[in-house]
Regions:
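Mature catalytic core of soluble alpha/beta enzymes
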Residues: 1-336
Length: 336
């Protein structure tokens, strides 16, 4: 999650119209969306973004019973399902990142994720440290059983139809859907001549242009497990996406042992390494979504190799001793 976004404007450097702004929140796909636009007070463009959020939630969510993704899951092992160009494009993007990550990012992880049930358990515990009873942890037999059905290569595409060849597989686009939707919102706003703004989809931050005074936006990266909400560092960006995956976002503890939601597709268990979070800076929020999870699973050394092989992408790693590691000095990363 991104801790803070600084978008204040200097009166002496901005034109009167640039002082105008409009900001609005909504709640979609179980997260808070906040959109702030500069140079306008008209809410209609934000409302247009919220309409898009609703459209894509109904299309892509596996918790919406008649979504295209849910229909693919219901037909697993039986038949092809006709889907929209948007759903098809996102599934292809998921397959692409499956190849890029050698399966560490896998959009057929649905049933394994369901077994761990991080979101519901973490949200419903009254414990300050998310301490829960050991009975909530799935058995190794269950984990290995679900893991055997995690394989993005079981996704078959024929024209605009999609099928899961494994009847026990379950598609889950949650790892890239928010980024995809953020990119769609940005394209829509730019088509309406919006030149300055911030789209925040539950921590997926995508900026449009620069601040209205011509300076960069400052995006704070949350200090893991810090309840104050203070950032551990901040990065200055313009017209970029900033996406973070961290173990502190959804987790629970059993007898003090932490179980987090970023699952290792080679073991079925939460990834074990020395990372607390990975932040990706990129042009595309969808790419940032997939890469943040992928890089976390790979660990710092292999993740740096991957990032260095890509154009226009950088990463910021926060380790379990709160050290900060970056892939380059291209961005101004300030620490507290």
């Amino acid at each position: 999650m991104l801790a803070a976004i600084t978008g204040s404007m200097s009166a002496c450097e901005s034109k009167p119209n640039d002082q105008q702004k409009v900001s609005k929140q909504g709640f979609y796909f179980d997260t808070i969306i906040q959109i702030t636009l500069y140079g306008t007070t008209d809410e209609k463009y934000i409302d247009g973004c919220f309409d898009m959020a609703k459209k894509y939630e109904d299309m892509l969510s596996n918790t919406v019973s008649d979504s295209e993704v849910s229909r693919i899951n219901a037909a697993a092992g039986k038949e092809y399902v006709t889907v929209s160009d948007d759903t098809l494009g996102l599934i292809k993007k998921g397959i692409e990142y499956g190849d890029t990550s050698d399966g560490r990012f896998d959009i057929t992880i649905g049933k394994l994720s369901d077994s761990w049930n991080f979101s519901e358990i973490a949200e419903n515990t009254d414990s300050k440290d998310n301490e829960v009873d050991a009975s909530v942890v799935p058995s190794d037999t269950q984990i290995q059983g679900e893991l055997s059905h995690v394989n993005y290569r079981n996704i078959q595409i024929n024209g605009n139809t999609v099928m899961l060849t494994d009847s026990e597989a379950k598609l889950d686009l949650g790892g890239i859907a928010k980024g995809f939707i953020a990119d769609k919102m940005k394209a829509y706003l730019q088509s309406k001549k919006i030149t300055s703004g911030i789209i925040n989809l539950g921590g997926n931050v995508l900026t449009i242009g620069k601040k209205s005074d011509g300076s960069d936006y400052t995006v704070g990266i949350q200090k893991p497990f810090d309840e104050s909400g203070e950032p551990i560092c901040a990065v200055k960006i313009k017209d970029k996406s900033v996406v973070t995956s961290g173990i502190y976002e959804r987790y629970y503890r059993v007898d003090g042992k932490l179980y987090h939601h970023i699952l290792d597709t080679t073991t079925g268990y939460p990834v074990k390494n020395n990372l607390y979070s990975v932040t990706i800076i990129s042009d595309s929020s969808c790419d940032g979504d997939a890469l943040s999870t992928t890089c976390f699973a790979l660990g710092i050394d292999k993740a740096k190799e991957l990032i260095n092989s890509l154009s226009g992408v950088e990463a910021i790693f926060v380790t379990d001793d709160y050290s900060i590691v970056t892939t380059s000095d291209e961005y101004d990363v300030s620490t507290n």
